[in-house]
């Protein structure tokens, strides 16, 4: 394959990827518009999509299944109560949801610090239904979870949002309140630190 043909294929693949992304975003916005009209099936769909994601995001930071479930439930309740306040300005709806989750986790850490009490529960529940089965498989990787503890908070947020939840740099920047350039730098430093930690523990 000559260079021109290779470039053409690359550009075509990128165009297709962007088209799929635009289509996904339009579908999500339509779902949000329906949820803002409080259509039950739309609200239910948002719950189905985001509860497992927020549960995993929370558990990887809290190591406590009950706290993670409480956070996920509280976030989804807040999303329903304030969904009419969401206005699309280029940032995906998912970034708005994860920002709520991040703020709740930060508040929880602050309350724990004030009480000088940190409760960690390393067990994984076995009685969850299907929505949590994939999460449980992911969380079996104890070395990875332990390595996350060696990252700064912003580095950990970038890794979780990028690789566990699939958000792009623009969305991550919105969630953590940093620039896209800062997100790229945090991602690079986090991956270097993770490789070192996993290598040392291996």
Predicted regions and their residues:
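Amphipathic, Lys/Arg- and hydrophobic-enriched alpha-helical face
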Residues: 12-16, 47-65, 82, 98, ...
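Sigma70-family region 2
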Residues: 36-37, 60-65, 74-91, 111-113
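Helix-turn-helix DNA-binding module
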Residues: 146-157, 161, 165-182
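Arg/Lys-rich amphipathic alpha helix in sigma70-family domain 2
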Residues: 81-88, 98-120, 137
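Internal acidic/polar
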Residues: 11-17, 24-25, 115-137, 141
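C-terminal edge and immediately downstream basic/flexible tail or linker adjoining helix-turn-helix-like DNA-binding
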Residues: 2-13, 137-138, 174-177, 191-202
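Structural recognition of an alpha-helix C-terminal capping motif at a helix-to-coil junction
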Residues: 70-77, 91-103
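A short, charge-rich alpha-helical start-of-domain segment used by transcription regulators
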Residues: 26, 32-55
């Amino acid at each position: 394959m000559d260079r021109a043909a290779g470039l053409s294929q690359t550009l075509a693949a990128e165009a297709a990827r962007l088209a799929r992304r635009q289509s996904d975003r339009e579908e999500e916005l339509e779902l949000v518009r329906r949820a803002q009209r409080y259509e039950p099936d739309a609200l239910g769909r948002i719950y189905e999509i985001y509860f497992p994601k927020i549960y995993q995001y929370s558990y990887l930071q809290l190591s406590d299944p009950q706290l993670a479930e409480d956070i996920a439930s509280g976030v989804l309740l807040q999303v329903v109560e304030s969904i009419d306040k969401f206005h699309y300005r280029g940032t995906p709806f998912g970034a708005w949801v994860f920002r709520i989750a991040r703020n709740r986790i930060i508040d929880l850490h602050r309350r724990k610090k004030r009480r000088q009490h940190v409760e960690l529960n390393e067990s994984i529940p076995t009685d969850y239904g299907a929505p949590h089965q994939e999460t449980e498989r992911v969380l079996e990787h104890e070395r990875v979870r332990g390595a996350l503890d060696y990252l700064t908070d912003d580095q950990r947020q970038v890794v979780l949002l990028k690789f566990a939840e699939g958000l792009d740099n623009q969305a991550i920047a919105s969630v953590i309140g940093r620039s896209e350039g800062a997100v790229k730098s945090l991602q690079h430093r986090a991956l270097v630190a993770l490789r070192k930690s996993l290598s040392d523990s291996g």
